[in-house]
Regions:
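Structured beta-strand/loop patches that form or line metal/cofactor-binding pockets in enzymes
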Residues: 44-73
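Glycine/serine-rich phosphate-binding loop and adjoining beta1-alpha1 elements at the start
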Residues: 98, 117-233
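Glycine-rich phosphate/diphosphate-binding loop of Rossmann-like nucleotide-binding domains
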Residues: 199, 204-313
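Flexible, glycine/charged-enriched surface loops at secondary-structure junctions
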Residues: 22-25, 43-48, 121, 158-167, ...
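Adenosine-phosphate binding glycine-rich loop
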Residues: 2-27, 223-224, 337-450
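Rossmann-like adenosine-cofactor binding region
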Residues: 268-367, 372
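General beta-strand structural signal in soluble alpha/beta enzymes
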Residues: 162-166, 190-194, 239, 262-265, ...
Length: 450
């Protein structure tokens, strides 16, 4: 609840101006509620209108993306880049190609990205972009033509010292390759650090593909060790999603001794009491691009439920939501509690509604918020940029070790900040306060024109 008059005034004004952007308002309110103890200790923030500046993107770029489909028909989509905050480094955040993309969702993601990047300790600001283009069902040539058209406008707004995009939902290695190739052609320069998630043959980093899922498990393991004197060993884990984050969270959780029993897609979820056959899921999703229901057709004992929202009714010790925003509501959270869940760490961006988070906290669930627990992807993007700058390529083990250290550091920074804020163990409050303080200090140092 917002009790600070300054923060309440800022939020009310923002809500009036952005009434049609519920995801953005949800993200802002969560942060403002968390940072109240910090703001009350710094009256200079109000004088400098720091919060008013923090919640407004520095720049929003919107543009048309015309492209020609395989039938020779001209299609037009809308492209965006939200350059939210560059106080601690060049804008950094993914590109999302999905029909649901709109300005409000990208503002929410860019706002969250600002604090997530701050938590990594790497010099990266916050941004997000994308298009309402849907790559599913499109041929490789159609995807290539779209990516080239998208970059033909975006290239003038980005660069390794300005704004460094990456992949996200709908933007994988194929799309990143097409985008990078067009940028290189338009600028006649090879700026490896201007786009991350690249292929290994042209500046990509080992362990980048695995990073978000692996990082989620490293964060979860460190939280369990320090807050519960426990580990992932022997735990039953429910995972939503079957994309990059879910697949590699499943892989690392299994390596750490857990048993993952579910994965899902937008149509439904599969439950395998014997543990998910990850090799099959990788082939299904990364090679054949099939639907998760095919898993149950080939695995004895596995069952498929044609409602992805019901995955949270499966009994478990740990839940790792890795699909999309607001996938867990109050009822889903209550189902997790009823099923014996004691830990929820987020792999997707803001997958829990505020009401769900209240259920977690009121029932003593160890809750790892997305901006902390899923920061592994952008952290390793930062490591990819470092390798590009040094003209070096680190081994998988080197990158993985750095990732593990960063994720453990994020946990400790969040925990310590929760103590300082008077909310010991509330990692949501801690992550918001820790991420905010670094950005706020930089903004104050750079003057009110910032």
């Amino acid at each position: 609840m917002l009790t600070n008059e300054y923060l309440k005034r800022v939020y009310d004004g923002l809500a009036k101006r952005n009434a049609n952007e519920p995801e953005f308002l949800q993200a802002v309110r969560e942060v403002l509620e968390s940072i109240q103890p910090v703001v009350e200790k710094h009256p200079e923030y109000e004088k400098a209108a720091l919060i008013e500046r923090l919640v407004e993107p520095e720049r929003i770029i919107s543009f048309r993306v015309p492209w020609v489909d395989d039938q020779g028909k001209v299609q037009v989509n809308r492209g965006y880049r939200v350059q939210f905050n560059s106080a601690i480094g060049p804008y950094k955040g993914g590109l999302r190609f999905h029909p649901s993309v709109n300005q409000g969702i990208l503002k929410f993601l860019g706002f969250e990205q600002t604090f997530k990047n701050s938590l990594t300790t790497l010099p990266m600001g916050g941004g997000k972009g994308g298009s309402d283009f849907d790559p599913h069902g499109k041929s490789d040539m159609e995807v290539m033509r779209f990516c080239q058209s998208f970059m033909t406008e975006l290239y003038r707004h980005i660069g390794q010292f300005v704004d460094c995009p990456a992949g996200d939902i709908g933007v994988g290695g194929r799309e990143v390759g097409y985008l990078f190739g067009q940028y290189k052609r338009l600028t006649n320069s090879f700026q490896g650090g201007m786009l991350t998630g690249k292929g290994l043959t042209f500046g990509g980093s080992l362990a980048r593909t695995e990073a978000t899922g692996y990082g989620l498990c490293y964060f979860t393991a460190e939280a369990l060790k320090c807050m519960r004197n426990d580990s992932l060993q022997g735990k039953t884990v429910v995972i939503s999603g079957s994309g990059n984050v879910a697949i590699y969270a499943c892989e690392k959780a299994t390596q750490m001794g857990a048993k993952v029993v579910t994965m899902s897609d937008s149509n439904g979820y599969v439950y395998d009491p014997n543990g998910i056959d990850l090799a099959y899921v990788k082939d299904l999703k990364e090679v054949r691009r099939g639907r998760i229901k095919e898993y149950a057709e080939t695995h004895a004992g596995a069952t498929y439920v044609a409602d992805c929202t019901q995955v949270w009714t499966v009994p478990c010790d740990i839940a790792l939501p890795c699909a999309t925003q607001n996938e867990i509501n109050k009822e889903s959270a209550e189902a997790l509690v009823k099923g014996g869940c004691t830990v929820v760490c987020e792999g997707a961006n803001m997958p829990s509604t505020p009401e769900a988070i209240e259920v977690y906290l009121s029932n003593g669930i160890l809750y790892g918020p997305a901006k902390a627990s899923n920061a592994g992807g952008v952290a390793t993007s930062g490591l990819e940029m470092s390798q590009n700058s040094e003209r070096l390529s680190w081994t998988f083990e080197e990158v993985d070790a750095k990732l593990k250290g960063i994720m453990e550091g994020i946990f400790h920074a969040s925990y310590d900040a929760s103590v300082a804020a008077g909310s010991e163990g509330n990692l949501m409050v801690g992550a918001n306060c820790a991420g905010f303080l670094k950005v706020a200090t930089a903004m104050m140092a750079q003057g009110i024109t910032y």
